[in-house]
Amino acid sequence: MYLKKINLKNKTALVTGAGKGIGKACAIALAEAGADLIIISRTQKDLNAVSKIIKKFKSKCTSYVCDVTNYNQIKNIIAKQKKIDILVNNAGNNIPEHFTKVKKKDMEYIVKLN
């Protein structure tokens, strides 16, 4: 990865949506660059897999199952941290439907999440 050229030793990164896709790739790249990680996803199984990869880089990894649209869950996670140097606010979702057909409650959720 390109971040390998950057030294992030003694830095802590929090990555939301870290269980899959771009969030997973970011978390792994940050670990490869030496950062310790706090990873958040809605799925424990995904967090376990990503955490295992991160630990291969000798980085500390703390994982939390969390719905980032739940303010209290996020607030509690943040309160437990000594420091956060890097934030990758990656969690997101979409509804595969033409925007004129999306239900109001679904649109509100997507806006809140993204």
At which residue positions do the language-model features occur?
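Aromatic pocket-lining residues of Rossmann-like dinucleotide-binding sites
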Residues: 30
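Conserved glycine-rich cofactor-binding loop
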Residues: 12, 19-21
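Conserved glycine-rich Rossmann-like NAD(P)H-binding loop of the short-chain dehydrogenase/reductase
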Residues: 35-49
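Conserved NAD(P)H cofactor-binding loop of Rossmann-fold oxidoreductase domains
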Residues: 91-95
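Substrate-binding pocket helix/loop in short-chain dehydrogenase/reductase
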Residues: 98-99, 103-111
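The beta1-alpha1 cofactor-binding region of Rossmann-like NAD(H)/NADP(H)-dependent oxidoreductases
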Residues: 45, 64-76, 104
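Conserved catalytic-site loops of classical short-chain dehydrogenases/reductases
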Residues: 85-86, 108
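Flexible N-terminal pre-Rossmann segment of NAD(P)-dependent oxidoreductases
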Residues: 1-11
